[in-house]
Regions:
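Interfacial segments of alpha-helical transmembrane regions
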Residues: 5-20, 77-100
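Interfacial loop at the N-terminal end of multi-pass membrane proteins
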Residues: 9-10, 21-66, 111-135
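Hydrophobic residues within membrane-embedded alpha-helical segments of Major Facilitator Superfamily
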Residues: 11, 18-21, 26, 71, ...
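Internal alpha-helical transmembrane segments of multi-pass membrane proteins, especially GPCRs
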Residues: 13, 92, 135-138, 142-145
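Core segments of transmembrane alpha-helices
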Residues: 64-75, 144-152
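Mid-bilayer segments of alpha-helical transmembrane spans in multi-pass integral membrane proteins
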Residues: 99-107
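Juxtamembrane boundary at the C-terminal end of a transmembrane helix
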Residues: 157-162
């Protein structure tokens, strides 16, 4: 039996931690942040979400979010040359799951966050825009939370799988 070792093991640890950190951030939004924002008057909820969206693309979070994707893809290249070993299947599953998280982020969340940035929180259509944003954004966030955390779990399993 062969366990993942050497540089691929280091990459797997990085991928597991990165996916877990990203999933944890998304979990916070799903578990309580969006619910709390939804309880605020629309103008306050919009303003708070706009402020978070401006702060989110910090270097540290971008490294965790997209760096994990890059590491996962590189790690999958290694896994593809070891398909006879069980850890490789878990690495490929972890990568696929995490990439779903990234795709949902880029294709769904970023455009909606950009559109929300253009909404005047005190404008006449603000309450309607917020109502259209809040629930679907949260539902799709559940998906990226689940896929990021499931990806992290798959990477962790790969570390101990022979």
């Amino acid at each position: 039996m062969t366990y993942i070792d050497g540089f691929p093991r280091i990459l797997t640890v990085i991928a597991a931690v990165g996916a877990g950190v990203s999933g944890g951030v998304f979990f916070a939004f799903s578990a309580f942040v969006m619910r709390a924002l939804g309880r605020l008057p629309a103008a306050q909820g919009i303003s708070a979400m706009q402020a978070m969206n401006r702060a989110a693309p910090s270097p540290l979070f971008m490294i965790a979010l997209f760096g994990t994707g890059i590491v996962s893809i590189a790690l999958s290249g290694v896994a593809l040359t070891h398909l006879d070993q069980r850890w490789a299947v878990y690495v490929l599953a972890g990568t696929a799951l995490y990439l779903v998280c990234l795709i949902v982020t880029v294709v769904y969340h970023v455009p909606r966050n950009d559109a929300l940035a253009l909404v005047d929180p005190t404008g006449p259509g603000a309450a309607h825009a917020w109502a259209r944003y809040l629930s679907p954004w949260t539902a799709w966030n559940h998906l990226r939370t689940i896929t990021a955390l499931a990806g992290s779990t798959a990477f962790i399993i790969a570390l101990g799988t022979a």
